[in-house]
Every structure is written in C-alpha cells, then in structure tokens.
Amino acid sequence: LAMDLGLAKERLERGDDPAGTVMLVGQAHDEAKRAITDLRELVRGIHPAVLADRGLDAALSSVAARCPIPVDLQVDLPERPPAPVEATAYFVVTEALTNVAKHSRARGARVRISRRGPMVTVEVTDDGVGGAVVQEAGGLAGLADRVRAVEGTLRLASPPGGPTTLLAELPCGS
C-alpha cells in the first residue's frame, strides 16, 4: 500500500504516466479496503459485537446454544465488568466449550460466572473423561496468556476419568 502510494506520488510530481498512476492509486485503494476488512474481522474476534451490544450473559447464551452438548449457564453479575475483563471471560468460556466439544466426550457442561469481591470468577466444568493438559502452543496456553494480560489467573483441574474444571479469576476493581 505504502509503496503503491509512494510510486503514484512520484509519478504525479514528475507529471508522467497518468494511466499508470491511476492504476497504482486503484491498487492502493483496493489494498486499503482489504486492510480495513481484515481489521474489522480482527476487532470482532477480540470483542464480538454481541458482547459489546448485549453483554456477557446474552453473548454466552448464544455460545451455549450453539454448543453441540448441553450447557447449563449461570451468569450472576450485578453489573457489567470492564470491557477487557468481559472479553476475557467470554473467550475463556468459548475456548473451554470448544475443548469440551472436541476432546472430552462429555455429556454436558456447566458454566458459572459470578462476582466475588473484586474478582469475576469464570468456572467451566464438564463431565467428560478428563486428562486435559495445557500444551505450549495450544488454545489453553493462549487463553492463559489472555487471562494474564488482565492480571488474572487460570487454573485447570482435569484428573483422568474427569471431571475437568477450568477456573479463571479476573480482577475488575473494588
């Protein structure tokens, strides 16, 4: 994009090759539109629209409804947490339910989100086979990084035979 615009600028300054300059500006315009689309998709991935528009309970209700196994969801928050905490809670649940559906052979999952003092607690438990581990390049490792980014903690308990529980504690002020 920058190279195309730089070349177009040079050609305009020299006054030569108007057709080529128009083509370069057109290419730069197309690249800019693609970049904007990519950024919008990235932002949605960071903070989904339903989360921003309707809050954590509605966003997670939608996630639970799409999960291939039954999910018992309880969100007990007296007020909306700060946006980074809300987004982190959302991604903890979505990653956990993805893992439950893919790996656990569970018949059901339970999600509990509550406020305990200055912390939002997110707990996802399944009745599957257990044995889950955090792998260095896996989704849970990335999730642990996301939780640490808001100064939270993430713990996994998954004994062989189950159940598996993922617990995130996310600070959100007093």
Located regions from the model:
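Coiled-coil dimerization/phosphotransfer module
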Residues: 1-174
